[in-house]
């Protein structure tokens, strides 16, 4: 009998970095077989765990091997779940509905490879997944949300290009089913977060408005939680390559200090 977080299949995956080993893993989440990508430094050692929670929906924003290898090269064992219904995984992606448990149980996958420190990172839609993971677990060391979504209702109104998909997945508009949007919004549950949170966001972001970051900071502050903000006046959703690399290094250092 398999349980949540059990690994049921592994296969070697081509790596863009000769110093990093990639493995595609199939694991169990609520009775579904979910897939994800594991990145491990080949140099022997004990490493912290890094849960990489991707942005996007279905094929948009899919996990990029080069990106998770980049984080692994900073000295982490990285696991990036694809979420249910993606790349051969069972079930349906629900935009932070029951699929939040694919992130929650991915921590149990990661623990089979790393030491006791588990850092959770979410980019864009991954931000909402990262916050839910930190709300639903007590064993998270730190959380970083970069250009992260924190409010499902705001995303619906901001992203006209995502409305059809969100209506289909969530079951209607925020006006028709406000409770379904509230149930996906982690802001109302941040008092359960036990890990420090780093919020990274660019003021010029047109995909995820800076207000997602400011609201998250407000709610964390109100709940007396430990958090830090790295806002940038000039950058949008995707930082330029040099700034991106610099931010990756800086956030990884921040994680290691917690």
Residue ranges of model-derived segments:
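N-terminal cap/lid segment of alpha/beta-hydrolase-fold proteins
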Residues: 2-43
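Short substrate-entry loop that stabilizes the transition state in hydrolases
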Residues: 45-47, 52-91, 153
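Alpha/beta-hydrolase active-site loop
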Residues: 94-113
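Short glycine-enriched nucleophile-adjacent loop
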Residues: 127-138
């Amino acid at each position: 009998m398999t349980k949540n977080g059990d690994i049921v299949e592994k296969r070697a995956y081509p790596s863009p970095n000769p110093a990093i080993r990639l493995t595609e893993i199939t694991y169990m989440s609520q009775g579904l077989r979910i897939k994800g990508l594991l990145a491990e430094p080949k140099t022997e050692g004990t490493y912290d765990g890094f849960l990489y929670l991707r942005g996007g929906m279905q094929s948009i924003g899919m996990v990029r091997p080069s990106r998770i290898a980049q984080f692994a090269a900073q000295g982490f064992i990285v696991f990036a779940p694809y979420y249910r219904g993606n790349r051969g995984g069972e079930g349906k992606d629900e935009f932070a509905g029951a699929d939040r448990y694919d992130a929650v149980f991915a921590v149990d996958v990661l623990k089979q490879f790393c030491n006791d420190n588990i850092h959770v990172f979410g980019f864009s839609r991954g931000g909402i997944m990262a916050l839910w993971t930190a709300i639903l677990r007590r064993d998270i060391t730190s959380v970083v949300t970069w250009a992260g979504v924190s409010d499902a209702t705001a995303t619906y109104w901001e992203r006209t290009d995502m409305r059809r998909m969100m209506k289909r997945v969530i079951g209607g508009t925020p006006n028709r089913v406000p409770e379904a949007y509230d149930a996906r919004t982690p802001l109302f549950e941040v008092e359960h977060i036990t890990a420090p949170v780093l919020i990274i966001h660019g003021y010029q972001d047109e995909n995820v408005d800076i207000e997602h970051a400011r609201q998250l900071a407000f709610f964390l502050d109100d709940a007396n939680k430990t958090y830090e903000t790295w806002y940038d006046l000039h950058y949008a959703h995707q930082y330029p390559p040099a700034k991106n690399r610099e931010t990756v290094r800086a956030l990884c250092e921040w994680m290691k200090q917690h």
